[in-house]
Protein backbone atom coordinates (compact mmCIF):
# COMPACT_ATOMS: atom_id res chain seq x y z
CA UNK A 1 0.00 0.00 0.00
CA UNK A 2 1.27 3.47 -0.87
CA UNK A 3 1.90 5.51 2.25
CA UNK A 4 1.65 9.25 2.76
CA UNK A 5 2.66 11.20 5.83
CA UNK A 6 -0.28 12.40 7.92
CA UNK A 7 -0.23 14.56 11.07
CA UNK A 8 -2.79 14.39 13.87
CA UNK A 9 -3.36 18.08 14.50
CA UNK A 10 -5.13 17.46 17.79
CA UNK A 11 -1.77 16.39 19.25
CA UNK A 12 0.65 18.36 17.05
CA UNK A 13 0.93 22.14 16.65
CA UNK A 14 -1.21 22.71 19.72
CA UNK A 15 0.54 26.03 20.32
CA UNK A 16 -1.22 27.32 17.19
CA UNK A 17 -4.83 28.23 16.57
CA UNK A 18 -6.81 25.42 14.95
CA UNK A 19 -6.94 26.88 11.46
CA UNK A 20 -3.20 27.64 11.45
CA UNK A 21 -2.26 24.01 12.03
CA UNK A 22 -2.99 22.96 8.46
CA UNK A 23 -0.35 25.24 6.99
CA UNK A 24 2.11 24.26 9.72
CA UNK A 25 1.68 20.59 8.85
CA UNK A 26 2.13 21.35 5.17
CA UNK A 27 5.28 23.36 5.90
CA UNK A 28 6.73 20.38 7.77
CA UNK A 29 6.24 18.08 4.80
CA UNK A 30 3.03 16.31 5.75
CA UNK A 31 0.69 15.41 2.92
CA UNK A 32 -2.46 15.05 5.02
CA UNK A 33 -3.89 15.75 8.46
CA UNK A 34 -6.38 14.02 10.72
CA UNK A 35 -8.17 14.97 13.91
CA UNK A 36 -10.50 13.48 16.50
CA UNK A 37 -13.94 15.03 16.99
CA UNK A 38 -15.56 16.73 14.01
CA UNK A 39 -18.47 17.98 16.15
CA UNK A 40 -16.38 20.68 17.82
CA UNK A 41 -14.97 22.06 14.57
CA UNK A 42 -16.27 24.58 12.07
CA UNK A 43 -16.32 22.27 9.07
CA UNK A 44 -16.52 24.98 6.43
CA UNK A 45 -13.56 26.84 7.92
CA UNK A 46 -11.68 23.56 8.34
CA UNK A 47 -12.07 22.64 4.70
CA UNK A 48 -11.10 26.14 3.61
CA UNK A 49 -7.94 26.06 5.75
CA UNK A 50 -6.93 22.68 4.32
CA UNK A 51 -7.53 23.80 0.75
CA UNK A 52 -5.61 27.03 1.31
CA UNK A 53 -2.66 25.07 2.71
CA UNK A 54 -2.83 22.51 -0.08
CA UNK A 55 -3.09 19.59 2.32
CA UNK A 56 -5.58 16.70 2.40
CA UNK A 57 -7.80 15.77 5.32
CA UNK A 58 -7.44 12.06 5.91
CA UNK A 59 -10.27 11.65 8.39
CA UNK A 60 -11.51 11.79 11.97
CA UNK A 61 -13.38 9.69 14.53
CA UNK A 62 -16.79 8.57 13.41
CA UNK A 63 -18.48 6.87 16.35
CA UNK A 64 -18.49 9.18 19.41
CA UNK A 65 -20.94 8.02 22.10
CA UNK A 66 -21.88 4.60 20.71
CA UNK A 67 -20.30 1.14 20.85
CA UNK A 68 -20.08 -1.67 18.33
CA UNK A 69 -20.13 -4.24 21.14
CA UNK A 70 -23.49 -3.12 22.53
CA UNK A 71 -26.30 -4.80 20.56
CA UNK A 72 -28.74 -2.11 21.72
CA UNK A 73 -26.59 0.57 20.10
CA UNK A 74 -26.69 -0.77 16.54
CA UNK A 75 -29.17 1.69 15.03
CA UNK A 76 -27.87 4.64 17.03
CA UNK A 77 -24.34 3.75 15.95
CA UNK A 78 -25.36 3.66 12.29
CA UNK A 79 -27.31 6.90 12.56
CA UNK A 80 -24.33 8.70 14.04
CA UNK A 81 -21.97 7.14 11.49
CA UNK A 82 -24.16 8.59 8.74
CA UNK A 83 -23.67 12.04 10.27
CA UNK A 84 -19.92 11.46 10.45
CA UNK A 85 -19.80 10.40 6.81
CA UNK A 86 -21.69 13.55 5.83
CA UNK A 87 -19.17 15.60 7.80
CA UNK A 88 -16.30 13.76 6.11
CA UNK A 89 -17.70 14.58 2.70
CA UNK A 90 -18.13 18.20 3.70
CA UNK A 91 -14.42 18.58 4.45
CA UNK A 92 -13.28 16.28 1.65
CA UNK A 93 -12.05 13.48 3.93
CA UNK A 94 -11.72 9.98 2.52
CA UNK A 95 -12.25 8.03 5.74
CA UNK A 96 -13.54 7.90 9.29
CA UNK A 97 -12.08 5.98 12.21
CA UNK A 98 -14.24 3.66 14.29
CA UNK A 99 -13.76 1.73 17.55
CA UNK A 100 -15.31 -1.17 19.41
CA UNK A 101 -16.25 0.98 22.42
CA UNK A 102 -17.33 4.57 22.93
CA UNK A 103 -14.51 6.78 24.18
CA UNK A 104 -14.96 9.72 26.53
CA UNK A 105 -12.68 12.56 27.56
CA UNK A 106 -9.03 11.61 27.42
CA UNK A 107 -9.84 8.42 25.54
CA UNK A 108 -11.39 6.79 28.61
CA UNK A 109 -13.60 3.83 27.67
CA UNK A 110 -17.11 4.89 28.64
CA UNK A 111 -18.48 1.41 29.35
CA UNK A 112 -16.52 -1.83 29.74
CA UNK A 113 -19.74 -3.85 29.33
CA UNK A 114 -18.76 -6.29 32.05
CA UNK A 115 -22.38 -7.46 32.00
CA UNK A 116 -21.97 -8.79 28.45
CA UNK A 117 -20.13 -11.98 27.56
CA UNK A 118 -17.23 -12.07 25.11
CA UNK A 119 -19.49 -13.88 22.64
CA UNK A 120 -22.21 -11.23 22.78
CA UNK A 121 -19.68 -8.43 22.31
CA UNK A 122 -18.01 -10.16 19.38
CA UNK A 123 -21.27 -11.03 17.63
CA UNK A 124 -22.63 -7.52 18.16
CA UNK A 125 -19.47 -5.96 16.76
CA UNK A 126 -19.54 -8.22 13.72
CA UNK A 127 -23.23 -7.63 13.07
CA UNK A 128 -22.96 -3.84 13.31
CA UNK A 129 -19.77 -3.79 11.23
CA UNK A 130 -21.59 -5.66 8.47
CA UNK A 131 -24.13 -2.85 8.34
CA UNK A 132 -21.36 -0.23 8.57
CA UNK A 133 -19.58 -1.83 5.63
CA UNK A 134 -22.75 -1.74 3.53
CA UNK A 135 -23.15 1.94 4.38
CA UNK A 136 -19.51 2.64 3.52
CA UNK A 137 -19.91 0.98 0.12
CA UNK A 138 -23.03 2.99 -0.59
CA UNK A 139 -21.45 6.29 0.47
CA UNK A 140 -18.03 5.51 -1.05
CA UNK A 141 -16.18 6.26 2.18
CA UNK A 142 -13.49 4.23 3.94
CA UNK A 143 -13.85 2.97 7.51
CA UNK A 144 -10.74 2.29 9.59
CA UNK A 145 -11.35 0.07 12.63
CA UNK A 146 -8.80 0.75 15.38
CA UNK A 147 -7.66 -1.63 18.12
CA UNK A 148 -6.41 0.11 21.28
CA UNK A 149 -4.11 -0.78 24.15
CA UNK A 150 -5.97 -1.90 27.24
CA UNK A 151 -3.34 -1.46 29.95
CA UNK A 152 -2.19 2.15 29.68
CA UNK A 153 -4.70 4.35 27.86
CA UNK A 154 -7.96 2.52 27.15
CA UNK A 155 -8.71 0.01 29.90
CA UNK A 156 -11.84 -1.97 29.08
CA UNK A 157 -11.73 -1.57 25.30
CA UNK A 158 -12.89 -4.78 23.63
CA UNK A 159 -10.89 -4.76 20.39
CA UNK A 160 -7.32 -5.10 21.62
CA UNK A 161 -5.50 -7.33 19.10
CA UNK A 162 -4.62 -7.06 15.46
CA UNK A 163 -5.60 -10.67 14.86
CA UNK A 164 -9.20 -10.19 15.98
CA UNK A 165 -9.60 -7.01 13.95
CA UNK A 166 -7.96 -8.46 10.85
CA UNK A 167 -10.01 -11.65 10.94
CA UNK A 168 -13.24 -9.66 11.22
CA UNK A 169 -12.19 -7.43 8.32
CA UNK A 170 -11.35 -10.48 6.22
CA UNK A 171 -14.62 -12.23 7.08
CA UNK A 172 -16.70 -9.20 6.14
CA UNK A 173 -14.69 -8.85 2.95
CA UNK A 174 -15.58 -5.25 2.15
CA UNK A 175 -12.81 -3.18 0.53
CA UNK A 176 -14.18 -0.11 2.31
CA UNK A 177 -13.55 -1.63 5.77
CA UNK A 178 -9.93 -1.84 6.91
CA UNK A 179 -7.89 -1.79 10.10
CA UNK A 180 -6.21 1.24 11.57
CA UNK A 181 -2.98 -0.28 12.84
CA UNK A 182 -1.50 1.76 15.69
CA UNK A 183 2.11 0.74 16.32
CA UNK A 184 2.15 2.32 19.78
CA UNK A 185 -1.02 0.58 20.97
CA UNK A 186 -0.04 -2.79 19.55
CA UNK A 187 3.51 -2.68 20.92
CA UNK A 188 1.93 -2.42 24.36
CA UNK A 189 -0.71 -5.10 23.77
CA UNK A 190 1.09 -7.70 21.70
CA UNK A 191 4.57 -6.70 20.46
CA UNK A 192 5.96 -8.56 17.42
CA UNK A 193 5.32 -5.52 15.21
CA UNK A 194 7.13 -6.79 12.11
CA UNK A 195 5.51 -10.25 12.24
CA UNK A 196 2.12 -8.61 12.68
CA UNK A 197 2.66 -6.42 9.62
CA UNK A 198 3.67 -9.50 7.61
CA UNK A 199 0.64 -11.50 8.73
CA UNK A 200 -2.06 -8.84 8.61
CA UNK A 201 -0.73 -5.89 6.61
CA UNK A 202 -3.15 -6.64 3.79
CA UNK A 203 -5.99 -5.55 6.08
CA UNK A 204 -4.47 -2.17 7.00
CA UNK A 205 -6.04 1.01 5.69
CA UNK A 206 -4.23 3.50 7.93
CA UNK A 207 -1.27 3.40 10.33
CA UNK A 208 -0.54 5.46 13.44
CA UNK A 209 2.97 5.82 14.82
CA UNK A 210 4.27 6.88 18.23
CA UNK A 211 6.91 5.35 20.44
CA UNK A 212 6.40 3.28 23.55
CA UNK A 213 6.49 3.88 26.40
CA UNK A 214 5.27 7.45 26.58
CA UNK A 215 3.51 7.90 23.23
CA UNK A 216 6.11 10.37 22.02
CA UNK A 217 7.93 10.74 18.69
CA UNK A 218 9.47 7.65 17.02
CA UNK A 219 13.00 7.24 18.32
CA UNK A 220 12.21 8.23 21.90
CA UNK A 221 11.24 4.77 23.12
CA UNK A 222 11.86 1.07 22.64
CA UNK A 223 10.37 0.49 19.18
CA UNK A 224 12.91 -0.06 16.38
CA UNK A 225 11.16 2.17 13.86
CA UNK A 226 13.96 1.88 11.29
CA UNK A 227 13.25 -1.83 11.06
CA UNK A 228 9.48 -1.36 11.19
CA UNK A 229 9.55 1.10 8.30
CA UNK A 230 11.83 -1.13 6.20
CA UNK A 231 9.50 -4.03 6.89
Annotate each language-model stretch with its function.
Residues 34-53, 100-107, 152-153, 213-217:
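Glycine-rich, proline-tolerant flexible connector loops at the mouths of alpha/beta enzymes
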Residues 203-217:
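A short, conserved beta-to-alpha structural element at the edge of catalytic cores
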Residues 175-186, 204-208:
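Aromatic- and acid-rich polysaccharide-binding/catalytic face
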Residues 51, 71-178:
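Active-site acidic/histidine proton-transfer and metal-coordination neighborhood
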Residues 18-19, 44-51, 137, 154-172, ...:
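Distinct, well-ordered alpha-helical segments
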Residues 68, 217-218:
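Short clusters of hydrophobic/aromatic residues that line enzyme substrate/ligand-binding pockets
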Residues 11-13, 37-39, 63-66, 100-104, ...:
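Active-site-proximal loop/turn and secondary-structure-junction residues that shape catalytic pockets
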Residues 1-94, 119-120, 170, 174-178, ...:
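N-terminal pre-domain/capping segments
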Amino acid sequence: MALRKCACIDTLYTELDWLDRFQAAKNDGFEAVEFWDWRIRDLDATREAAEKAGIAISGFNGDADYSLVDPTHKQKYLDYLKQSIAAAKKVGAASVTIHSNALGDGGIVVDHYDNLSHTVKLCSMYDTLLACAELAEKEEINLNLEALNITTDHVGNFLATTQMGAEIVRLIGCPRLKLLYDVYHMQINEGCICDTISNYGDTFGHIHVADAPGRHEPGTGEINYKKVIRH
